[in-house]
Swiss-Prot record:
Coiled-coil annotated spans: none
Protein name as annotated: Siroheme synthase
Function: Then it catalyzes the NAD-dependent ring dehydrogenation of precorrin-2 to yield sirohydrochlorin. Finally, it catalyzes the ferrochelation of sirohydrochlorin to yield siroheme.
Species this chain originates from: Psychrobacter cryohalolentis (strain ATCC BAA-1226 / DSM 17306 / VKM B-2378 / K5)
Protein's gene: cysG
Location of the region described as Uroporphyrinogen-III C-methyltransferase in the Swiss-Prot/TrEMBL record: 231-523
Length: 523
């Protein structure tokens, strides 16, 4: 973000507005709602401003601008139609280290007035950083229709009970869970329907019941207490990287989490959607360097749940497609930890859709197979002969690292060297790249263009459709007969080395014990 959103306390603080017309009126109206003591400085001040600021706490000064009036001002607003004067006001305020806003001149603003949704004490500010104020206002209009007015009353009610809740519920986690139940339950519905007295009574009853349960729990033995405080684990598929491809359920659980254990293939954009104050722990793995071994991850999930925490295990793609989600829930079951599994869009689906390569097509492919492309050193390529079916699409996960061995093994097994194959890098992301060729040419093409990980391979006749069906980031940057590169060139900025290393985190996990190819066939 280019500007940081802050909420400024201006109650009983001096604010200087230079200008007395309609623009000054709009700013004065907003600032007066925040309780500011407003001084308007202008040789002529509109009747509307005079009426708005009739309270004695405000001051109207009918004079030309003079920087001496800046003294003790918390913020300054330049709202004149004189460009030279506005620059002077900005210069004087800057010299005095006072934040200044020159209306409709973003480069002279230390702060920006956002579009505001006011449900006092709940306030939402929306800003385009001065780039598109009309768009910000349109977003505000949408939010106004989505957020009931009752949220303000609900927040005030919570403020009145805050002290009692803190006294009766000793733990931070317990208080947060209590308030979430209040805001998502009967109390909020009563408030939104206008039954304020009933809402107050319901909140008091909920608090009394919770306090009684805490007292009863403290009187039991440790085993009962541990059972009562058991949390829950959510195994969540984060999808391929584009946050718009998350499911609603994934987003909801991510925003409820107390702690998030995430893999290397979870994009920063998706991770940012988790609850802000949740603990975020990286447990990704890369070849021969695991941040946390799988058994350690299993133990972390169990222990966090036993602490009463809501745990999100966030995995790139889908948890049950080469993601070890099954191993993790086996561990959870053995410890009687409740869990949920939220599917995600797996990389194969995203890469195919965003590259314009249908995985099945009546004229080209009647089935699709998902296979891990990583081979252990020296492992026999016994499975390659199973990939000779030309009316089948094969998707190799994590195949880029072993691309030369993979393509040569397929050719040696009898697959035509002219078989179309594509590399899709950073599928669904703005820096997505697609490189197409054949089994015979793709290794040399990859050496030339250096598409980065994370990437997967799609092999089969359907790859030939990419030429006509590509739609996303559809910039053709290289063409040589049937070889295509879309979405970038060799000079395209690559992720930083740490991120590239993290992208390999799943490779070691996906190699089978016998060194063969692990696979999933969908007919």
């Amino acid at each position: 973000m280019n500007t940081f959103p802050l909420f400024f306390k201006l109650e009983d603080r001096k604010v200087l507005i230079v200008g007395g017309g309609d623009v000054a009126l709009r700013k004065a109206d907003l600032l007066s709602r925040a309780g500011a003591c407003i001084t308007v400085l202008a040789p002529s001040i509109s009747h509307e401003i005079q009426a708005l600021l009739s309270d004695s706490k405000h001051a109207l000064i009918y004079e030309n601008y003079n920087k001496t009036y800046m003294t003790d001002s918390r913020v300054i607003i330049a709202a004149t139609d004189d460009e030279t004067l506005n620059h002077q006001i900005h210069s004087d305020a800057t010299a005095l280290n006072i934040p200044v806003n020159v209306v409709d001149t973003p480069h002279l603003c230390d702060f920006i007035f956002p579009a505001i949704v006011d449900r006092n004490p709940i306030v939402i500010g929306i800003s385009s950083n001065g780039k598109a104020p009309v768009l910000a206002r349109l977003l505000r209009a949408r939010l106004e229709t989505l957020i009931p007015q009752g949220y303000g009353k609900l927040a005030k009610l919570a403020g009145e009970f805050r002290g009692d809740v803190k006294a009766k519920i000793p733990t931070l986690t317990g208080r947060r869970q209590f308030w979430e139940q209040v805001f998502e339950g009967k109390v909020s519905q009563l408030m939104f329907s206008g039954n304020e007295n009933e809402a107050i009574a319901q909140l008091q009853a909920d608090l009394d019941n919770t306090a009684a349960n805490i007292t009863a729990k403290n009187a039991t033995d440790e085993s009962t207490e541990a059972q009562n405080t058991m949390g829950e684990v959510y195994i969540v598929g984060a999808g391929p990287g584009d946050p718009e491809l998350l499911t609603f359920k994934a987003l909801r659980l991510m925003q409820q989490a107390d702690i998030v254990y995430y893999d290397a293939l979870v994009s920063p954009q998706v991770l940012d959607l988790c609850r802000r104050d949740a603990d975020k722990v990286f447990v990704g793995k890369k070849r021969s360097n695991h941040a946390v071994a799988q058994l350690g991850i299993n133990e972390l999930l169990v222990n966090s749940a036993k602490e009463g925490r809501r745990v999100v295990r966030l995995k790139g793609g889908d948890p049950f497609i080469f993601g070890r989600g099954g191993e993790e829930i086996e561990s959870l079951r053995s410890h009687n930890v409740p869990y949920q599994v939220v599917p995600g869009i797996t990389a194969a689906n995203a890469a195919a859709s965003y590259a314009g390569i249908p995985l099945t097509h009546r004229d080209h492919s009647q089935s699709v197979r998902f296979v891990t492309g990583f081979l252990k050193a020296g492992a026999p390529n016994n499975n390659f002969k199973s990939f000779l079916n030309t009316d089948e699409t094969v998707v190799f996960y994590m195949g880029l690292h072993s691309l030369p061995r993979l393509t040569q093994g397929l050719i040696d097994a009898g697959r035509s060297a002219k078989t179309p194959i594509a590399i899709v890098s950073n599928a669904s992301m703005p820096n997505q790249q697609v490189l197409t060729g054949t089994l015979a040419s793709i290794v040399e093409l990859q050496a030339q263009h250096q598409l980065p990980t994370p990437a997967l391979l799609i092999m089969g006749d359907v790859v030939s459709l990419h030429h006509d069906l590509a739609w996303y980031n559809n910039k053709k940057t290289s063409e040589n007969d049937n070889n295509w590169l879309r979405g970038g060139t060799a000079t395209t900025p690559k992720p930083n080395p740490n991120q590239q290393a993290h992208a390999l985190s799943m490779i070691a996990n996906l190699a089978t014990e016998d060194g063969g190819l692990e696979q999933l066939v969908i007919d």
